[in-house]
């Protein structure tokens, strides 16, 4: 029996997961070098990290890096479909355990959770017995939101009732908080006071952090990892360029060459999507609300249109905005028969999934896991991937290991920075110091066999930088 609690699909999958983790380590030089650099120092000794990121093979390497640097960890996935069950099992069993005697860390994640199960897993990663977590590592902001809203509702003495129009997910979230307030009064307030900081992985979660800060309810310092250059300009673009195609291929077996594709959003993720589809020979159009991004799309050769102008001709529609209400039910009615609709933003509200799932005049047939055909009132069908959630993780396995090495090296460094500098940071949102961003880049340049030119002292003085960096001012746009 394990000396800790966990909830994963099947521990017998651990061996398969361990083989994949071992291979991923070779593709994740950032994390492996940080292990080597900090193993003796143990900079995270005493850290109790509540982690909420997609429970993939790459995340397993991150978790075991945090543990190698001294941290204790409890983990859940941040998406109901994104867990790789073999990775979750391998992390619970650990490098030296067996399915009969797990010696890893507590994980609460499996592919295909219900919304109620998902929020129960979030509750579990904050339950440390006689201790409290003192760090959060988040992706999308759900874990952080649980602490902040839980504390607010404890102060108010009640969880607000469900209102008409509340999403299924928000109803499940309120249900979890209602249960914890009844069974463990004061839990979230105590956690808010214990946590030294949160590091946030993704655009959507960062938006939430800034909103909490503006609202004046952020109870601890936050590090915006998403906007580290080695995250947003690599994971968001190059990772998506790889994983979007992987997800669509696994889901549909559709040839993309010659197809009409509509990409909604031309931020870093949208750029990766458009480039990937164009590389497959698709005819790509882009929608965009920001005129700067729209101009970039045009200069890159992609027509910029309104959704209504292009959705009727599109064979594939992908949302990548991080916003809500991008594709309405009325726009779905205008789509081609058997067109494919997917999302690669963090939440499912970019697409009006509520109408598809709850209208009486819409029927659903599951083709295979995370691939559903919805027949609309006009008789046409559309194929929806991962119920409007992240298709690259629901229909495939997410971004490749090497690009996640940059993001997760950023996360590890940010955790060390906040944990070791308790008191230096106030309850605001910070960005990773540029010198650390450059450190992560340098590791990966060397891993790919690149040679970085070293400035002479005179050259460095001429442009006003240190020979060792940082080489660009904070306002520089890469």
UniProtKB/Swiss-Prot annotation:
Keywords: Cytoplasm, Hydrolase, NAD, One-carbon metabolism
Top-level taxon in the UniProt lineage: Bacteria
Record carries keyword Cell membrane: no
Organism per entry: Corynebacterium diphtheriae (strain ATCC 700971 / NCTC 13129 / Biotype gravis)
Name of the molecule in the record: Adenosylhomocysteinase
Gene (UniProt): ahcY
EC numbers for this chain: 3.13.2.1
Cofactor: NAD(+)
InterPro entries, sorted: Adenosylhomocyst_ase-like_sf, Adenosylhomocysteinase-like, Ado_hCys_hydrolase_NAD-bd, NAD(P)-bd_dom_sf, S-Ado-L-homoCys_hydrolase_CS
Protein's UniProt keywords contain Coiled coil: no
GO molecular function: adenosylhomocysteinase activity
Entry's family note: Belongs to the adenosylhomocysteinase family.
Binding residues for substrate: 56, 139, 201, 231, 235
Function according to Swiss-Prot or TrEMBL: May play a key role in the regulation of the intracellular concentration of adenosylhomocysteine.
This protein's pathway: Amino-acid biosynthesis; L-homocysteine biosynthesis; L-homocysteine from S-adenosyl-L-homocysteine: step 1/1
CC cofactor note: Binds 1 NAD(+) per subunit.
Localisation per UniProt entry: Cytoplasm
CDD domains: SAHH
A Gene Ontology cellular-component term: cytosol
Major subcellular site: cytoplasm
Residues the record lists as binding NAD(+): 202-204, 236, 265-270, 288, 323, 344-346, 392
Catalytic activity: S-adenosyl-L-homocysteine + H2O = L-homocysteine + adenosine
Gene Ontology BP terms: L-homocysteine biosynthetic process; one-carbon metabolic process; S-adenosylmethionine cycle
Pfam families, per database record: AdoHcyase (PF05221), AdoHcyase_NAD (PF00670)
């Amino acid at each position: 029996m394990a000396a800790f609690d966990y909830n994963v699909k099947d521990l017998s999958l651990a061996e398969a997961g361990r083989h994949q983790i071992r291979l991923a380590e070779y593709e994740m030089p950032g994390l492996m070098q940080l292990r080597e650099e900090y193993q003796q120092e143990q900079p995270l000794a005493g850290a109790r990290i509540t982690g909420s990121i997609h429970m993939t093979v790459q995340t397993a390497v991150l978790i075991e890096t945090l543990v190698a640097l001294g941290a204790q960890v409890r983990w859940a996935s941040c998406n109901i479909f994104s867990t790789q069950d073999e990775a979750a099992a391998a992390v619970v069993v650990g490098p030296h355990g067996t399915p009969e005697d797990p010696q890893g860390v507590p994980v609460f994640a499996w592919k295909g959770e219900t919304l109620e199960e998902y929020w129960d897993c979030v509750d579990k990663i904050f339950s440390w017995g006689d201790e409290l977590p003192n760090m959060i590592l988040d992706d999308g902001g759900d874990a952080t939101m649980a602490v902040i809203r839980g504390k607010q509702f404890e102060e108010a003495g009640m969880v607000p009732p469900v209102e008409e129009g509340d999403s299924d997910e928000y109803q499940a979230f309120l249900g979890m908080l209602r249960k914890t307030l009844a069974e463990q009064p004061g839990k979230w307030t105590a956690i808010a006071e214990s946590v030294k900081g949160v590091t946030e992985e993704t655009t959507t979660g960062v938006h939430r952090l800034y909103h909490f800060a503006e609202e004046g309810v952020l109870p601890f310092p936050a590090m915006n990892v998403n906007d580290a250059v080695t995250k947003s300009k690599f994971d968001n673009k190059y990772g998506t360029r790889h994983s979007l195609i992987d997800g669509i291929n696994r889901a549909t077996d559709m040839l993309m060459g010659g197809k009409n594709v509509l990409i909604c959003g031309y931020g870093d993720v949208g750029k990766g999507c458009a480039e990937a589809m164009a590389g497959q020979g698709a005819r790509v159009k882009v929608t965009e609300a920001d005129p700067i991004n729209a101009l970039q799309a045009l200069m890159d050769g992609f027509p910029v249109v309104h959704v209504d102008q292009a959705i009727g001709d599109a064979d594939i529609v992908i949302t990548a905005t991080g916003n809500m209400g991008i594709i309405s039910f009325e726009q779905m009615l205008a789509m081609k028969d058997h067109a494919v609709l997917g999302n690669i933003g963090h939440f499912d509200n970019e697409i009006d999934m509520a109408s598809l799932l709850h209208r009486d005049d819409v029927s659903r047939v599951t083709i295979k896991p995370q691939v559903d055909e919805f027949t609309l009132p006009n008789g046409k069908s559309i194929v929806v991937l991962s119920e409007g959630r992240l298709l690259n993780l629901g229909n495939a396995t997410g971004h490749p290991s090497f690009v996640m090495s940059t993001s997760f090296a950023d996360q590890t460094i940010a955790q060390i920075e906040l944990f070791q500098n308790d008191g230096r940071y106030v309850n605001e949102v910070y960005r990773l110091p540029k010198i650390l961003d450059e450190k992560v880049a340098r590791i990966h340049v060397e891993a790919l066999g690149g040679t970085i030119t070293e400035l002479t002292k005179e050259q460095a003085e001429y442009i006003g930088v240190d020979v060792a960096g940082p080489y660009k001012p904070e306002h520089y746009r890469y």
